[in-house]
């Protein structure tokens, strides 16, 4: 029923959730005085971070979406449950570059939820063309809108990425660092 890739993802998700819950349970062990055992808490915090890292990387790899559009002004672009309205394109000038800036609105019914302004920048010295990504970060999902160099004046090539759980990758690294540092601190205090 499942492909080999899906079984691997299910296995990794299950193992990471198990690691997170077991680490939380072990980290909250109490001694005879009903106080939390501090060295175990640091170790468990680092393991929770590692489990969360695996969980968020697998979830991102599994549920991330990308769609490429050829769009013109006033087009509506749909990716999963997200609707984007391509509002405008204009030329702007920066300190050392000229840019083509597009405006996309993330819509909910007729309400604008967020605004994206990706750019194509042309630098004169040295001559370079770059695409500047517009990113909106939410708690559970990051959304990227990238505009590529237009092939003609009627359409703009647009890539929209929906990346879930990116924030949790950063949170997991912070948890691992705090857990590791606290385990080291409590170990040094115990030695003295």
Where does each model-flagged region fall?
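Solvent-exposed, non-transmembrane regions of integral membrane proteins
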Residues: 1-192
């Amino acid at each position: 029923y499942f492909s080999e890739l899906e079984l691997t993802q299910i296995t990794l998700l299950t193992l990471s959730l198990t690691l997170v819950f077991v680490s939380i349970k072990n980290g909250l062990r109490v001694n005879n005085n009903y106080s939390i055992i501090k060295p175990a808490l640091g170790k468990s915090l680092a393991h929770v971070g590692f489990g969360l890292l695996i969980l968020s990387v697998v979830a991102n790899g599994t549920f991330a979406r990308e769609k490429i559009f050829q769009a013109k002004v006033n087009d509506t672009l749909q990716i999963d449950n997200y609707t984007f309205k391509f509002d405008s394109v204009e030329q702007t000038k920066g300190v050392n570059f000229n840019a083509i800036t597009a405006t996309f609105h993330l819509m909910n019914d007729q309400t604008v939820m967020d605004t994206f302004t990706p750019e194509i920048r042309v630098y004169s010295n040295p001559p370079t063309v770059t695409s500047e990504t517009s990113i909106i970060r939410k708690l559970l999902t990051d959304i990227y809108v990238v505009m590529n160099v237009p092939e003609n004046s009627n359409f703009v090539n647009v890539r929209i990425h929906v990346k879930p759980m990116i924030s949790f990758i950063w949170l997991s690294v912070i948890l691992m660092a705090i857990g590791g540092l606290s385990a080291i601190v409590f170990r040094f205090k115990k030695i003295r």
